């Protein structure tokens, strides 16, 4: 299940020190690697000055604000090592601060009231405010990711992420829905490795225990690419499609490769 990490440390650490410590870990951060940095992340949350300094620096250079930020606007990228891990701050607006005439439109920006999983493990800590409220379920099985597909969801807990509380979320296992903080403007800090290539991220309906849609678009682009290959490419690409159809991490991508093979190279499709 999603893990609340029992750490209680009053020491502090600088952001640069935290990044250096994490960088000394293995090239691909595992769950155990992330858990080994739980105390360090809490120490960073004890540092009440580093985020202020970062915000001031961003404000002084507002015209170049977060140009390399590939996430949505609630996220402030703080640093990390490209291709290995990122450290970021997530801003959580309380319900009263959501746009009065477009509150429903703002909720997806913060993933509020959207049950979703993640295609990466990550460690998080509350930094400011009483934090969002979250209901966490476990996806106990596998899913192909088709809209309306039934999944085996088991309720785990309903909790919050207040200051200094550390939690670990497991890729493709922990499914949660977040509700806006009741009163407090809140901030959390995250340590996360890159998404697992080929692993999907989904939205869910807890009441019906079904997948509602895919959350990310990269695999959809891969599927269109293979569709085009089946129409346009010569025989030099058939072995590549066969390899994708048997070994890619995404079932939907494997299926797209098999469709392309069946259309253009039906003999190879039998091997997929």
Where are the language model's segments positioned?
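Ligand-binding loop in jelly-roll beta-barrel domains
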Residues: 162, 171-191
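Charged, amphipathic alpha-helical linkers/stalks
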Residues: 195-237
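Short acidic-glycine-tyrosine-enriched beta hairpin
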Residues: 118, 124, 140-171
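Conserved short histidine dyad/triad with adjacent acidic residue
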Residues: 59-61, 89-120, 170-172
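A short hydrophobic beta-strand segment most commonly corresponding to one strand
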Residues: 124, 134-136, 182-199
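Conserved hydrophobic register position within alpha-solenoid helical repeats
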Residues: 222-228, 254-261, 272
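Amphipathic alpha-helical scaffolding segments comprising HEAT/armadillo-like alpha-solenoid repeats
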Residues: 207, 235-245, 267-272
